Amino acid sequence: MKKPNGTNGASSSLEPPPSTFQPLCHPLVEEVSKEVDGYFLQHWNFPNEKARKKFVAAGFSRVTCLYFPKALDDRIHFACRLLTVLFLIDDLLEYMSFEEGSAYNEKLIPISRGDVLPDRSIPVEYIIYDLWESMRAHDREMADEILEPVFLFMRAQTDRTRARPMGLGGYLEYRERDVGKELLAALMRFSMGLKLSPSELQRVREIDANCSKHLSVVNDIYSYEKELYTSKTAHSEGGILCTSVQILAQEADVTAEAAKRVLFVMCREWELRHQLLVARLSAEGLETPGLAAYVEGLEYQMSGNELWSQTTLRYSVVVD
């Protein structure tokens, strides 16, 4: 088995600029990872043992515990299960056309709502159905608030925008949907039991958008080699290369490695902007205790996403 340079989506020579953000992980990470991984190993149709090992090595529950380190102990497993199944579906979509992927996701939407019963012989259907039913049983109001953000994310995954030429600004706007920022925000609120009013959420829209850029670009930096490999081996539509690394490299006429270094500096600027926007919110007397917890949660999403992206084997490229 050959493992080329650039595993974890970035060459070993890439040294990120220092960050003032410090990641935090949920204290139940080991327990919940074992529980959730065990569930999917039992129920998901992995094609072979190699795929099962790759799934465990990706650490989907770990990234969820880094995203939501202050989730309530009795809710973190819901978040882990939801992000895990969405990651697994995302992998399947790479080998489908946009039309096939859209049909696949659209079939899951009414099942998620509970409007249609699942086919119990199809794991993805009953996993999705059972998960949403259990989340609604725990907190129907907050679970229902996650539905539309999840559907927005699922539809962005198969949006033909991915195949169109985009500048960096247009790309970041698209990725706000594709990276699932609204989904992550709603799932964070659910996992923390954090109820915010529409007016409170309106006050942090700019902070949300800023966080989305950071999440998207950090993922792009570390997943570039994996995405490049996928673009050559997966479906021509589902596996299309759509990344800020490629866009900046082409627009600025620099190498992919140079583009990564520039993008990392931008990420640090977005961190500074996050701090400035949060300080302004407080100075204007608009920060409630709920919003203070929310914007702190966004900071943990950014730092946690970066730590996971640096270390996950999901972004490794392994060639047999």
Curated annotation (Swiss-Prot):
Residues in coiled coil: none
A Pfam match: Terpene_syn_C_2
Residue span of region Disordered: 1-20
Domain of life where this protein originates: Eukaryota
Keywords: Lyase, Magnesium, Metal-binding
Residues binding Mg(2+) 3: N219, S223, E227
Pathway(s) it belongs to: Sesquiterpene biosynthesis; aristolochene biosynthesis; aristolochene from farnesyl diphosphate: step 1/1
Note on how the cofactor is bound: Binds 3 Mg(2+) ions per monomer.
Entry's Gene Ontology BP terms: isoprenoid biosynthetic process
Family assignment from sequence similarity: Belongs to the terpene synthase family.
Subunit field text: Homodimer.
Role played: Catalyzes the cyclization of trans,trans-farnesyl diphosphate (FPP) to the bicyclic sesquiterpene aristolochene. Produces germacrene A as an enzyme-bound intermediate that is not released by the enzyme, but is further cyclized to produce aristolochene. Aristolochene is the likely parent compound for a number of sesquiterpenoid toxins produced by filamentous fungi.
Record-given protein name: Aristolochene synthase
